Amino acid sequence: MKKQSGFTLIELVMVIVILGILAATALPKFADLSSDAEKASLQGARGSVSSASSIAHAAYLVDSTTVSIEGTAVAFANKYPTAATIAAVAGLAATDFTTSVTGTVATITKTGGTADCAFTYTEAAANAAPTISVVADGGTSAAVCP
C-alpha cells in the first residue's frame, strides 16, 4: 500500500467550509467601519466644541470687550459663545460638519453622515455653562452615537 502524503478531498472541503463560516462571522464587523469613523469624528468635534467654549469663556473673563479667536469674532451669551458662532470658534470646517441653529441650540452633524448621529450645543443660561448633548437615533437611543 502507498503511504498517504497530502489531504483528502473531504478534508479540503471541510477547511473551506470552516473558513467560509469564519468569514461570514467577521464580515459584518469590517463592513461597519464607516459608522465607527463617523462616530469617532463626531467625538472629536464634540471635544473641540467643549474646549473652544471653555477657552472663549476664559478669554471673555480676561477681556470682556471683544474676543477674537483665530481671526473669528466671538459673540457671547452669558459669558460663553453663542450657538451661532460655536462651530466657527471650534474650528469645525463647513466641508466636514453641518451646523443648524434653532434659537439657542446648535445641532452639529457630520457632513454626508446620518442625521441620527449628532450632538447639540445649547447656549449657557445665567451663571451656568453651556450644555453639550448627544443626539442619537432621533433622540431615542444612545447606542447609535457615542
Task: Label every model-predicted segment.
Residues 6, 32, 41, 68, ...:
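Residue-level preference for alpha-helix termini and adjacent loops
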Residues 37-63:
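Membrane-proximal N-terminal amphipathic helix
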Residues 58-146:
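Periplasmic/extracellular, small/polar-rich flexible segments of pilin-like filament-forming proteins
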Residues 1-34:
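N-terminal single-pass transmembrane signal-anchor helix
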Residues 19, 27, 35-40, 83-94:
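Short alpha-helical interface patches
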Residues 19-20, 50, 110-112:
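Alpha-helical interaction segments
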